[in-house]
Amino acid sequence: VKIKLWGTRGSIPAPGPETIRYGGNTSCVGVTLSDGSMLALDAGTGIRCLGLAQPDEPARLHILLTHLHLDHIQGLVFFAPAFRPQTEIVIWGPASPEASLRDRIARYISAPLSPVEVRELPCDVSFRHCPESEWEIGSARIRAASVSHRGPTLGYRIDDGDSSLAYIPDHEPALGADLDQLEEDWISGFALARDASLLIHDGQYTDAEYPNHVGWGHSATSHALSFARRTGADRTVLFHHDPMHSDDELDALGREARDRWIGFGGDPARIELGAERAEYELPARAPSALV
């Protein structure tokens, strides 16, 4: 299973000389499953570069949206495969009593916000609400569950063979509670991240910033690390960086996170901050024990 980060920023794109190392594009993660199936997790501005990296040939792509805030869908109309008639795109997302997924996305992909409307996309595009039960895409088993954030919001777990990826980019698990005191069943997103090979998790705020943003739907560094420790994730990537944080500030946040992880008795190499174009590879099968 190959994973590549195409957009790691939260809220709004933050291009410029101070965000070169970690990137300024908003949320998008590319996942290539062991059978070659291609997934995109969210469609922020990072999906534009993901699309440009795809070969111009018939393909079936799945886009899994966590929610419909602009920073997670604003790249859809700049996704090159959507303008190829030979491409089939399946867009998954949260259900809402308000309107269908297609109709909610069409509010953005329509005038006056977009020069292109959903019905004008030349690709074969379909929209599906994520089921409450596990389902399959290619070689993977996919699970979606509601998590603590503003509006209908999902986190995802992707299991392919013996490897698992948990993707929870917008998440406030500590809202009104101490994570270390909660039982597992009361921790938002716990089942998605339990013993994950790789956890990509919201880490937007420093601990000093969080008190002014309680209820906004995002995590402080300490909350993200407590969540990772409680769930037993093997490796954690902090994601959805605040647009106000420069590369140097994120470097400092990363050092603080690793020091805190050492305090938990953990290996600091298992904690890192997500950077655009970073790649990870998870084995679909665990190595066999030596005989």
Give the predicted meaning of each segment.
Residues V1-P169, A174-L179, G189-F190, D247-V291:
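Binuclear metal-dependent hydrolase catalytic cores
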Residues E172-A269:
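Cap/insert and terminal regions of metallo-dependent hydrolase folds
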